[in-house]
Amino acid sequence: VRADRPGPLRHAWLRKSLLLLLLAGLWEALARWQDNALLLPSALQTARAFAAGMLSGELPGYVAASLAVLVQAYALGVAGALVLTSLALGSRSGRDLLETLTAMFNPLPAIALLPLALLWFGLGRASLVFVLVHSVMWPLALNAYAGFGSVPETLRMAGRNVGLNGARLVFQVMIPAALPAMLSGLKIGWAFAWRTLIAAELVFGTTSGQGGLGWYIFQSRNELFTDKVFAGLAAVIAIGLLVEGLVFQTVERLTVRRWGMQRQAPGSPG
């Protein structure tokens, strides 16, 4: 069975690669028809700008600055969400606290808090971390709490019947059963945080010290280097695809798919 698994992976990547090539061809044709590189650079011009930025070290430096802030804020947001979820699972008052806070803050766009963050923490890393923690914490807390709440009572009883209790019951039964919902919350939190970070650097000019990817796009727009703007956008998309494909899909494949808790899509990598 294992020997057959490279086939679906190869075919899936082939289909996606062909789709990307088709989109790039349409982009190139539209840019040539528009014939205005200031408004719409071609795919080839963007590729050259992207390659030049990578080879010069300019783009990797901006990417590293953005990811450093994102990883720090993401870790803090995950920790805060787990604390809130633990309180909600442990007592009625904790549940009321989680429900009240998520009802208040989950619908609130993180970027709307940035003006306050700039007043409180100034123009720098702390303001970005504050709004990114807000982006991560509430969707993850909601999904984690829903995941733990949906664990069937029969599954808990089965764990107790084989001698599991306390921490062993939590780690061997509860967390694996709630993991699909928790992974969904982690992915939603990542997506919210990533786009909030780029928007904050782009719209408000907020930087993490040496500037991030959004700042690179902002500066390129000011200097009318539209090809570099598109190169920065391509970097944003590429990082999103890499995190989704290499991190989250790998975790899903090694956990919930292997355990039979999530159905594998036809043609997806096994």
Where are these regions (language model features)?
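Periplasmic/extracellular loop-to-transmembrane helix junction in inner-membrane transport proteins
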Residues: 3-10, 32-76, 215
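N-terminal signal-anchor transmembrane alpha helix
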Residues: 7-34
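Transmembrane-helix boundary motif in ABC transporter permease subunits
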Residues: 72-102
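C-terminal transmembrane helix and the adjacent membrane-cytosol boundary/short C-terminal tail
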Residues: 92, 149, 226, 230-270
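Generic hydrophobic transmembrane alpha-helix motif, especially the helices
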Residues: 103-139, 146-147
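Glycine-rich helix-loop "coupling/hinge" segments at transmembrane-helix boundaries
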Residues: 119, 197-226, 230, 235, ...
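Transmembrane alpha-helices
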Residues: 130, 134, 166-200, 231, ...
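Short helix-to-coil transition segments within interhelical loops
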Residues: 148-154, 158-178
